[in-house]
């Protein structure tokens, strides 16, 4: 039995969906512990591309229970559309369970998110505009609406009255936006609640029962380490905790329940939205990575910013999350390059530093110090073992393992399930006995 957390080791979009999908084969329960529809993951199964935002990747396995935990925020309209899409693809959704204590994104959250971002002008954060930040803000202010509230009309009326009055006041007086109708919201969200009711459970209790029965539990994070509210490039961050510690809070478990933490990182780096990005590329190289890697957001469709692999933020992710091993994705995107650079340190104020600075003003001044490695200039997409990889591709992976000071357990060389090299079973294999330098 092993309980595993999967996290993003960069700024999100690392390919966690594919890795979680693969690991879900060994999991009895998969738990999404934070975030909302601001995160998306793409899974390719038998030439079908499934784009999910809220539903855990494990839903594709017929014997896996999928939980959406208390640390998430739910947009019921989008969640129901995803469930409908899964049903259309003959996927059983009866195994999906939703925490009664998860908070719900309301119409005013989306309006406020978009209005506040527009008002920031040149200081915008790069929010998806899906209402995630305002939903978490109401949760902290203890005026939020939870899933359990939309299951009962009388309760929803009581819970919604004061918050809607406040939000309409802000929308009208500050942003000149027409107020929202109380009765329309009640009608809409009670309908959502009626449809979601069969899936609503005491999520924490379900997890504890699974743990006592010695089931394999997989905790699935959204976004990435550098987007964490406390440990990321604040204020250019999300409103929740994608780091491994967030799994304990968002799922309601103690840290001793976690056996392993697996970090997912691309073989290069990407970022969506605003904020400093030391290894960011421009021109033809940026275009090449974006085109080859299909670097457009699942949620917003925005083009991702692309850059070389950053070992400094990588080591930071190892430390913050307590990573046991890595999954390196999109190695194949680098196949055609003559040479590949890796950031091993920064230059800040004419001094070399090898650590991530949480001061965003200083971080924005950091200049990458690179080491250059030879490219392999041959296809890796058909490789199914380390021995089949080009020698220079192996050199690159070993360099990353040494730089990050953790072993590599999985290498992904394409979007399909079978385009994966399992170096060692990251769940049941020997700890820290995988691909290292």
UniProtKB/Swiss-Prot annotation:
Enzyme Commission number, as recorded: 6.3.4.4
Residues the record lists as binding IMP: 13-16, 38-41, 128, 142, 223, 238, 302
Assigned GO CC terms: organellar chromatophore; plastid
Pfam families given in the database record: Adenylsucc_synt (PF00709)
Residue ranges crossing the lipid bilayer per the database entry: none
Keyword GTP-binding (UniProt): yes
Role of this protein: Plays an important role in the de novo pathway and in the salvage pathway of purine nucleotide biosynthesis. Catalyzes the first committed step in the biosynthesis of AMP from IMP.
Name this protein carries in UniProt: Adenylosuccinate synthetase, organellar chromatophore
Natural source organism: Paulinella chromatophora
């Amino acid at each position: 039995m092993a309980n595993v957390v999967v996290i993003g080791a960069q700024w999100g979009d690392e390919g966690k969906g594919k890795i979680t999908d693969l690991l879900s084969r060994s999991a009895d329960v998969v738990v999404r512990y934070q975030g909302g529809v601001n995160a998306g993951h793409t899974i390719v199964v038998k030439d079908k591309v499934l784009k999910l935002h809220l539903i855990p990747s494990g839903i594709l396995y017929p014997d896996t229970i999928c939980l959406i935990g208390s640390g998430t925020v739910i947009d019921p309209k989008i969640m129901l559309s995803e469930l409908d899409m899964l049903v259309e693809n003959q996927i059983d959704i009866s195994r999906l369970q939703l925490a009664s204590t998860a908070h719900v994104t309301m119409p005013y959250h989306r309006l406020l998110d978009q209005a506040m971002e527009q008002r920031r002008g040149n200081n915008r954060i790069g929010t998806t505009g899906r209402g995630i930040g305002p939903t978490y803000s109401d949760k902290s202010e203890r005026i939020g609406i939870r899933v359990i509230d939309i299951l009962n009309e009388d309760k929803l009326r009581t819970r919604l009255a004061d918050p809607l009055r406040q939000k309409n006041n802000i929308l009208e007086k500050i942003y000149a936006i027409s107020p929202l109708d109380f009765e329309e919201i009640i009608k809409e969200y009670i309908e959502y609640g009626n449809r979601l009711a069969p899936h609503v459970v005491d999520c924490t209790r379900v997890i504890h029962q699974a743990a006592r029965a010695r089931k394999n539990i997989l905790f699935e994070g959204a976004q990435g380490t550098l987007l964490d509210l406390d440990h990321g490039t604040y204020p250019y961050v999300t409103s929740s905790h994608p780091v491994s510690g967030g799994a304990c809070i968002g799922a309601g478990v103690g840290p001793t329940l976690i056996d392993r933490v697996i970090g997912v990182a691309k073989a290069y780096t990407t970022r969506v939205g605003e904020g400093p990005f030391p290894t960011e590329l421009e021109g033809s190289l940026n275009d090449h990575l974006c085109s080859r890697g299909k670097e457009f957001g699942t949620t917003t469709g925005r083009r991702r910013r692309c850059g070389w692999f950053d070992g400094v933020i990588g080591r930071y992710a190892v430390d913050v999350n307590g990573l046991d091993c890595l999954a390196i994705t999109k190695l194949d995107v680098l196949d055609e390059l003559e040479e590949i650079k890796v950031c091993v340190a920064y230059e800040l104020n004419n001094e070399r530093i090898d650590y991530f600075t949480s001061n965003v003003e200083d971080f924005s001044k950091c200049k990458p110090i690179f080491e250059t490695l030879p490219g392999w200039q041959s296809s890796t997409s058909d490789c199914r073992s380390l021995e089949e990889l080009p020698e220079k591709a192996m050199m690159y992976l070993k360099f990353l393992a040494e730089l990050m000071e953790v072993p590599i357990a999985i290498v992904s060389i394409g979007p399909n399930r079978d385009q994966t090299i399992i170096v060692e079973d990251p769940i049941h294999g020997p700890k820290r006995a995988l691909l290292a330098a």
